[in-house]
Amino acid sequence: MIVRTTQAITGTERDVAAKDWRSKRIVLADDGVGFSFHETTINANSVSEFHYRHHVEAVWVVEGSGTLTDHETGEEFPLLPGTMYLLDGHERHRVTCHEQLRMLCVFNPPVTGQEVHDESGAYPAPVAS
């Protein structure tokens, strides 16, 4: 059994931040459970581009508001508490944040926790262990 709190993660190597977002990596690849689980906060009035070419991501919006844009179709979806989106086709997408968003995210395969988005918004391919 693994029990962690976001308070215990804050300020550690599991607390990863960039210009417009912060992600607390609660469950990671080294936990050996086949997925990773994160609490991610995106700053208000920001725009972030993502493209997870090597991962499937499920996102549950807990608080805030924004817009999700699918770059392939141009379709836009409101992001409000209670909204889930699943990037099961490795979609290139944009998150436009109106009010600070707090989201719970699951990645498969799991991330290690120190990945950095490249210029396209993607994480590198996972390395087999």
Swiss-Prot record:
Pathway: Amine and polyamine biosynthesis; ectoine biosynthesis; L-ectoine from L-aspartate 4-semialdehyde: step 3/3. CDD domains: cupin_EctC. Keywords: Lyase. The keyword DNA repair does not apply. GO terms for molecular function: ectoine synthase activity. One of its GO terms (biological process) is ectoine biosynthetic process. It catalyses: (2S)-4-acetamido-2-aminobutanoate = L-ectoine + H2O. Its EC number is 4.2.1.108. Belongs to the ectoine synthase family. Catalyzes the circularization of gamma-N-acetyl-alpha,gamma-diaminobutyric acid (ADABA) to ectoine (1,4,5,6-tetrahydro-2-methyl-4-pyrimidine carboxylic acid), which is an excellent osmoprotectant. NCBIfam families: PRK13290.1 (NF009806). This is L-ectoine synthase.
